[in-house]
Amino acid sequence: FVESVACPSREFAQRRFLIKTDAELNDIMATSAVEVSINVLLGLDPDGRAPEARPSKSTSDRARAEVRKEISQSAKALKTSLGDLVAGRSVDMAHLTQAAEDNAGIWSDSTVVALEVTRLKSKDETTYVHSLAVSGMMTLLARSLEMDEETTGILGVAGMLHDIGKLLIPSEILTKPGKLTDQERLVIRNHPEAGYRLLQSYPDLPPVVLDICRLHHEALDGSGYPLGLKQKDLSVPVRLSTVCDVFEALTSVRPYKRPWTSTEALDWMFARPHFFDRKMVIRLGSVIADAPLH
């Protein structure tokens, strides 16, 4: 399914369509098209059928229990590391990097199970498991985009630290089950800036880690926060982090809503190109669609 075709001659302006035959593909290749954006979620299988429902994501109880145990242990370790950062204590950055690599391994080996396990979080571990999930998805997406291993590792660390500002929010606001007041909402919205200021005191952190902490709630049209930056001022790593962060939030269990399916979340984000980088949304969909079911 073609979402858009970049053509100097504008043959396909504002058109979205499904390619069903080789002849149709050849017709596109004969135009001035220089780039085609594909939506794998709306396409057909090679035999012309719409994709069938994927096999059940349920795996053996043993596999799920093992992944749950690994993520729980990682969440406890991350809680300690983030607590040290908030308290101003020195933190071994090599340890953080290794933790991000270990977490990436879980997500690479057991993507579907990790998605299942991290959707349901206890109140006490929400921020930490969310951060691990975002970190894992960011590394998967970075590798899919063929970023080098050093950059991928840094993005893994950035995912783990992106919500550290939430630890500076009073717990009665952060975990409030009901509707937030306007003032409470302002406190919540301050967490990217608060986290950024905290991480500034750690000069060993790469600049992109601070950028992602500060800017992961920005939107391409400038309607995000805290700075209201627009597309031209938002780097690829920041756009990547935004897509992973929102996807994880939408597909997680919350007291006030059911978790969205992966397809629902991806479709919702894809329909909002003024907020999210569509190429990142499509690529994340591909990563999840190609994930091993074990």
Where are these regions (language model features)?
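Non-catalytic interface/linker regions that flank or bridge core catalytic/transmembrane domains
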Residues: F1-K121, E125-T126
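Histidine- and acidic-residue-rich, metal-dependent catalytic cores
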Residues: S74-H294
